[in-house]
Amino acid sequence: SDKEWIRTESILKAKVDKVFSFYKVKKSYIMNLHRNMDLNYEDHREDEAIDYKMQMKKLLKKRTRLQVLRVNTDSPLEKTTKEFLKDRLNIKDHQFFTYTSPFNMGYVFKLENNLKSVCDPNLFYDSFSPKLGQMIDPNKSMFEQIEERDRLLIYPYEDIDSFLKLLEEAAENPDVISIKITIYRLAKNSKVVKNLLKARENGKEVTVILELRARFDEESNINYSQTLYDEGCTILYGTEDYKVHSKVCLITYKDASGNIKYISQIGTGNYNESTSKQYADISLMTAHPGIGKDCNNFFNHINLENVNHIYENILAAPYTLKSSILEKMEREIKKGKDGKLFLKCNSVTDKEIIKKLSEASQAGVDVRMIVRGISCIRPQVEGYTDNIEIKSIVGRYLEHARVYIFGDNEEIYIGSADLMTRNLIRRVEVIIPIYDPAIKEKIVEYMNIQWLDNTKGRMINSQGKYEKISVTPGEDLINSQEAMMELAKNRQPKADPNSKKNKKVKVEKKEKWLDKIRQLFKK
């Protein structure tokens, strides 16, 4: 290659005597500190929203002075230097680590295009960009097609642009009265914020519940809150005792007869068009009047800081979500060997949930779980969790969706909550029932493909260890994320350039090897 790269810290280390020319340099190190990043918000909440925002700004400044947890260096420290740091930073020997690799690899992403020309191609994934959703009609407006039936997107295989288009239409539609949305994390130069500002400019009521306590996004959210506030949006900062972690968007409008109608969007992931290309999430858009009414009540109650409300369709933490999940598990327990639970989430830590899962296993319920992160329940423990299987999938994309299937695909819920105590009783979360049969089928297919993953999937054994999945000679290797990418490519609708709205969508039918996967579902 005719190009070479060198890290800035390496230059500084090599020229440290020039930088500190007034000192005699005996030894130099590349070093970084990891601090405790947890902030105590409870003592800094003020009555007025603007005061709270100012308090958050002050609180963030404390983060640079929080306790050091570890020290990383590029070579072992001399004894005197180490003792000096131990004393000044109030840390012990076990908190020092030596690395020969860079401490922060974030810069590699910026070099990707340069590296492709000089590195082994096998080091890179094949390029992939999100496709138009299978259920999205490119020949119709988002409003029109959501009014016809519910629409589902599975990121990053299907593009978040369809949701952004919905917001854009809402901003321009003269019949739209208001847009309400909960925000936890946003992209840099957020298109969501751009559409909300356009809506406000066009006279819509825009209400944003913006959580300032989203870890590491506090400063970004403070800045966005000011931008939205300056343009006349109503900004709420969640509730005093609970982080608002739910992903809910509600568009209220009038139909031709003057009736109030709703379009609701509930998802498992953030309104972040950047991470939607890296995180595997699910997003439902629906005109279901009952769900719309629930979402409207949800925003009204959050405005009043009332989190203890029972809704007709949606389940919300911290009041009804946990008890409802336990009740649905109990229903499957009563079925005995005919009971089924198929669950997907990031982590499982709640004691009552774990106890109920164990009861389900002992009653003969077939329990399948896809848990990417922490699992505090051990499967396959004789006499306790014999009927529980747990798989973790770690691949190209971060598995972030939460799906809860009760019975033989009888009830399916998606939403923002994990089976963790913090999500179930210490946060405001929302999960939503899936009513549309075609969407149920799509989610079940997604879950089944994940369960068949024998490439990136690992099973947790009775000791809590992760094991590779054994593959017999001749057995198909299935990478669930690659399978979803292939489905998205083959199923994306194609717009007819000669057609106008309301013409039937053309869909490519090139399933090829994915037919094998479907056959496996039927076995």
Regions found by a protein language model. Name each.
Residues 1-341, 359-363, 375-399, 403-523:
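N-terminal localization/anchoring segments of enzymes in phospholipid and broader phosphate metabolism
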Residues 366-370:
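Hydrophobic alpha/beta core scaffold segments
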